[in-house]
Structures are given as structure tokens and as C-alpha cells.
């Protein structure tokens, strides 16, 4: 069932989150960026969001994969979009006024196996981008490939006594998973930091139950979002994500010369403007976008 644009859908709950005055231009009626509170529930503001988006001739819709389009699972290879989420994303991809993109920490090759080919892909936190037959890889990723291999071999040795920790080679980057492992995050991070210290040109960052290792280049999900929006000269941009690495994308929305909105999946302090509860809330939001907020045709620049 498609969500009610009044916001009374069970997946896009209304709540007593209060509006705050002031704020940046765009879809939000307040300045959530500096708040200590979690973003407001999106269901409280659907009527306003619909009014803004329905006037925009083109929307770039960017979404994380794990925890956003697909539930978090113990084994990352088993993560998959629920059928109803996949249908909702495909339906939006069929709209000429919508350009959906998945912006993920997963490798581009991994995303290709999971996502409809009509959807733009930004892998490894934006170090790789594929749109149709076009593919781009950040030059810094190739330059630091051997250093990354050495560092990950070092990490694997340091964590050998924790068999449930897994090092995933993603080509341009690597991820050390410790969900369900005996090793806590501090132990894993210490092992990664020690390995990275011996390899100039690499940097470690935290994710949800993971530590990411990547080339030390000025590139993150926010850069990917800016480029995707600018390439299409979009009139509106929406980013949906759950991870701490998605905060770069939420922050980048402020720099865009168009309507913009960040949607957090879950509840925590965030630079996002709104939130939904979970992957099913994302599904409801995608269906609502298709049915209520994004006309199938029309519009102009």
C-alpha cells in the first residue's frame, strides 16, 4: 500500500517532533544542522515536501544500500533488497524526471550484481561511479592499490585470533567487518590504525560495525552527490542513508544550488533534515515519491 501523503502511513509516522524556526533554504522548515536532536519524522512534513518536489523539473535521488535499501545482516554478502523495495526503486527509475543513484561503500562490481542497470552507481564512497556505459575511477585509488593490499594483509595477521572478523577487499578500498565478532570496535580500530600507520597515503574511518580503509584523497559520498546532481542540472536532490559515512552526503546538500533534502534511516543525531524508521520506511517513501510527489511527465526548466 502506498503511503498516505498526509503522513499517516505506518511507515512514515507522524509524531510530536516540533518544528524549529530559521534554517537553510530548501525543503526543511528549520535548521536541523546544529541541533542535538534527531531529525523530525518525515511523515510530519510530507505535504510541504510534495509541494516543493512537484514543482521541480528533475530530481536526483541518492540512496545508500546497506541499512537503507537492504536490511543490515550479519553476513554482508547476503544483504539484499526486499522485493517491494526493489519494485519501488525500479518504478522511480522508469520516471523521466527522476535519476536514482545508489551511493555506497560497496565496490562498484558488487553493486552491479544487486542493482537495476538503469540506476546510477557510486561505489567505494564515491571513488567509483558508473552511469550507463560510462565508468570513472578516482586516480588516487589505483595509485594506492599496493599499499592497501599490504595494509590489509597486516590487519588480517593482527586480528588472526578473532576468526569472526572479516577483511573485505573492495578494490579501491577495504572494509574490516566485526559485526558478531568477539573483538570490539576499539580492538579492531587499533589493529587497523597500526597497519595504516606503516602505509602513507591510506586513512581509516569508522562505519556501522566496520572500519573502512581507503586512499587518503579528498573524496567522500558528498563529492559523489554533488557531481551527480550537477551533471544532470537537477532542480532537486534527495539523499537517504543510515550510516555515519552518509553524513558527508547530508552536509553536501547545503552546497547545492537546488532544493535539497536529507533523510536519515533510524534515529540519532544527524545532519539530515528528516528521518524514517527503517528499510520499510524507505520503501514507503519511495512509493510516496512515485505516487504523490514526482509527476510522470511535464515540468520544465
State where each predicted segment sits.
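Short, structured coil segments at secondary-structure junctions
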Residues: 115-118, 200, 256-258, 271
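Short amphipathic alpha-helices in soluble, non-transmembrane regions
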Residues: 151, 155, 187-197
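Non-catalytic pre-domain segments flanking phosphatase-related domains
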Residues: 1-65, 69-70, 84, 230, ...
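Short beta-strand
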Residues: 165-169, 203-206
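A generic structural motif
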Residues: 172-178, 210-215
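Active-site phosphate-binding/coordination module
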Residues: 80-168
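Mg2+-dependent phosphoryl-transfer enzymes with acidic/Ser/Thr/Gly-rich catalytic loops
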Residues: 27-42, 222-301
Amino acid at each position: 500500500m502506498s503511503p498516505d501523503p498526509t503522513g499517516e502511513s505506518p511507515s512514515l509516522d507522524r509524531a510530536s517532533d516540533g518544528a524549529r524556526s530559521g534554517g537553510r533554504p530548501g525543503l526543511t522548515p528549520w535548521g536541523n544542522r546544529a541541533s542535538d536532536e534527531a531529525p523530525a519524522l518525515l511523515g510530519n512534513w510530507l505535504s510541504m515536501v510534495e509541494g516543493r518536489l512537484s514543482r521541480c523539473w528533475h530530481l536526483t535521488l541518492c540512496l545508500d544500500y546497506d541499512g537503507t535499501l537492504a536490511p543490515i545482516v550479519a553476513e554482508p554478502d547476503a544483504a539484499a533488497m526486499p522485493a517491494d523495495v526493489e519494485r519501488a526503486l525500479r518504478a522511480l527509475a522508469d520516471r523521466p524526471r527522476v535519476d536514482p543513484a545508489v551511493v555506497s561503500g560497496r565496490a562498484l562490481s558488487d553493486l552491479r550484481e544487486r542493482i537495476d542497470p538503469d540506476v546510477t552507481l557510486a561505489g567505494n564512497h564515491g571513488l567509483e561511479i558508473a552511469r550507463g556505459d560510462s565508468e570513472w575511477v578516482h586516480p588516487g585509488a589505483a595509485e594506492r592499490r599496493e599499499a592497501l593490499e599490504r595494509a590489509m594483509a597486516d590487519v588480517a595477521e593482527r586480528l588472526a585470533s578473532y576468526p569472526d572478523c572479516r577483511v573485505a577487499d573492495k578494490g579501491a578500498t577495504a572494509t574490516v567487518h566485526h559485526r558478531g565478532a568477539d573483538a570490539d570496535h576499539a580492538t579492531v580500530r587499533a589493529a587497523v590504525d597500526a597497519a595504516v600507520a606503516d602505509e602513507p597515503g591510506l586513512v581509516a574511518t569508522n562505519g556501522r560495525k566496520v572500519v573502512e580503509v581507503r586512499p587518503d584523497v579528498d573524496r567522500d559520498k558528498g563529492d559523489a552527490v554533488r557531481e551527480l546532481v550537477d551533471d544532470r542540472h537537477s532542480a532537486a536532490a534527495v539523499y537517504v542513508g543510515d550510516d555515519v559515512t552518509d553524513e558527508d552526503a547530508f552536509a553536501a546538500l547545503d552546497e547545492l544550488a537546488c532544493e535539497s533534502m536529507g533523510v536519515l534511516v533510524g534515529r540519532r543525531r544527524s545532519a539530515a533534515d528528516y528521518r524514517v524508521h527503517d528499510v520499510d520506511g524507505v520503501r514507503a517513501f519511495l512509493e510516496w515519491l512515485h505516487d504523490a510527489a514526482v509527476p510522470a511527465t511535464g515540468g520544465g526548466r
